[in-house]
């Protein structure tokens, strides 16, 4: 996995507004707050989506993928103009979330990051 693939995977996970949440990393079908890595999570904030990507898929739990995901978060921080991804998530609309992910993808592509 590379930075762009990580950002696209998070975008795919959050594309449906019903799979996005605020105020918690993730939620289960009962709307209870859970960790993004919890297999019962069905809704995710931005950070929870990155957690799912890193820890839910065993094949992605490698050191290289860890760094790709960390770098992807940094591109997202640049895209939103803030170090606080959770605050951005909780104070934004779903449309703003997808727009920020698109911007982060474009920034990574512009810098030819893989």
Give short role names for the model-derived ranges.
Residues 1-114:
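Domain-length accessory/inserted modules outside core catalytic folds
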């Amino acid at each position: 996995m590379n930075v762009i693939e990580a950002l696209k995977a998070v975008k795919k996970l959050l594309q449906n507004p019903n799979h996005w949440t605020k105020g918690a990393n993730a939620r289960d079908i009962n709307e209870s707050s859970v960790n993004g890595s919890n297999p019962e999570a069905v809704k995710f904030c931005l950070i929870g989506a990155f957690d799912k990507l890193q820890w839910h898929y065993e094949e992605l739990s490698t050191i290289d993928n860890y760094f790709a995901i960390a770098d992807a978060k940094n591109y997202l921080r640049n895209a939103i103009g803030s170090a606080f991804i959770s605050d951005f998530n909780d104070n934004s609309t779903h449309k703003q979330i997808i727009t920020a992910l698109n911007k982060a993808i474009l920034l990574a592509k512009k810098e030819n990051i893989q």
